[in-house]
UniProtKB/Swiss-Prot annotation:
Required for microcin H47 production. Possibly involved in a regulatory loop modulating its own expression and that of MchI and MchB. It is a single-pass membrane protein. Keywords: Cell inner membrane, Cell membrane, Membrane, Transmembrane, Transmembrane helix. The gene is mchX. It comes from Escherichia coli. The chain crosses the membrane at residues 15-37. The lineage of its organism: Bacteria, Pseudomonadati, Pseudomonadota, Gammaproteobacteria, Enterobacterales. This is Protein MchX. It is found in: Cell inner membrane.
Length: 39
C-alpha cells in the first residue's frame, strides 16, 4: 500500500516536471523567435 502511494507521488511530480519543462521550452522558443524578428 505504501509503495503504491509512493509510486503515485512520483508519477505526479514527474508529470508536473515535464509540463514545467514543456512550458519553459515553449517560452524560450517564443523569446528566440521574438529576438530573431527584432534584428
Amino acid at each position: 500500500m505504501e509503495f503504491a502511494t509512493n509510486r503515485v507521488t512520483v508519477n505526479d511530480s514527474r508529470s508536473a516536471l515535464s509540463s514545467t519543462l514543456l512550458l519553459s521550452l515553449i517560452m524560450s522558443a517564443t523569446l528566440l523567435e521574438y529576438s530573431l524578428s527584432m534584428t
